[in-house]
Amino acid sequence: MSKGVHFGIDSYLYRNERFCFFIYKQERKATNMNSIVGQIRIPSGCAIAAVISKVGKKMTGERIIDSMKPMHDRSNGLGGGFAAYGIYPEYKDFYALHMFFNDRTSRKNCETFLKEHFEIVKSEIIPTRKIPSITDEPIVWRYFVAPLKSILLSHQLDEKEFVARAVMKINTEMAGAYVFSSGKNMGTFKAVGFPEDVGVFYKLDEYEGYSWTAHGRYPTNTPGWWGGAHPFTLLDYSIVHNGEISSYDANRRFIEMFGYKCTLQTDTEVITYIMDYLLRVQKLSLQEAASVIAAPFWSTIAAKDNETEKEKLKFLRTVFPSLLITGPFSIVFGFNGGLMALNDRLKLRSMVVGEKDDKVFIASEESAIRVMEPNAEQIYAPAGGEAVIVRVKEGAY
């Protein structure tokens, strides 16, 4: 942003790790703030939050929606969204495809493709609530599907790989159609707007899940659009991200060699595909994947006393150098049966964790945790590169 830019108000950009915003107390009522939305680059913006029950206890979306309200200034209305796990128990064996369509023609064309490759057990519009703050919405639809066994046999693919390829094909080759969620017994809900409004728009108070993640977006290098809002998902993996990764091009070039297509104009998309590649394709554990994307410095590895751990970390850094994510970031990674929270190795973005009874809370700010659970205990900030992994009790989800 040029230093000469003037917006007609006395504006001072305060940059620090916790929040960035414009001071416009006196003139706010007289100024149309919509005219500058999206024009200001706030690299430490964005808000993330998550809650999970370790025993699989269901909760509505109200709590996670409320958690975003005290972090309102971290967003600018150009993207908000949620991921919820355990919300489709009656269709838990089917892939829930959440989709945006520009028009009926694009939906019809996409359905033709789906019918040729999947058994569609249910097709319906995703219920929404009309509110003034969410406008210009596309057609928002969902399908519960299972890959046709004859197609799997002819392609010699397992169903997860087949679904992932189908998602890539739709998102890159079918004009006006976009799959923004594709997992089993989970769903992503996102839009252009503030997250607390997006939650109301999608009626998330009527859904029940054992795990929720949320994101309020402040785009740094890309436009705000429905597909670009977080979370980003592939199969049951979802990512909400606060930060700006400087390794995007190197990461993207590497991951696209394995069939992934980065088309959504954001660095967060590549993190989702990296996690899918490391966990589903390479069969790494969550801790190992964390040690790849937020790898310790070589000097830190050399100082390790445990030789087994030292050799393992050296191996991961040597084999996957192009998947090291550099630059400031904090992420919450969702999957069926758990969550993982992770900071960059220098901890250049805030992230706080708290607990109460069977629940674990994660957020950019402690205030968000206190909204979800005023009596939260064991509040702490994980160290840079320290993975916080929470799993639901086996058989409880």
Stretches with model-predicted labels:
Residues 24, 32-397:
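Conserved short alpha-helical segments that host acidic/polar catalytic motifs at enzyme active sites
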Residues 5-22:
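Short, often N-terminal, low-complexity regions
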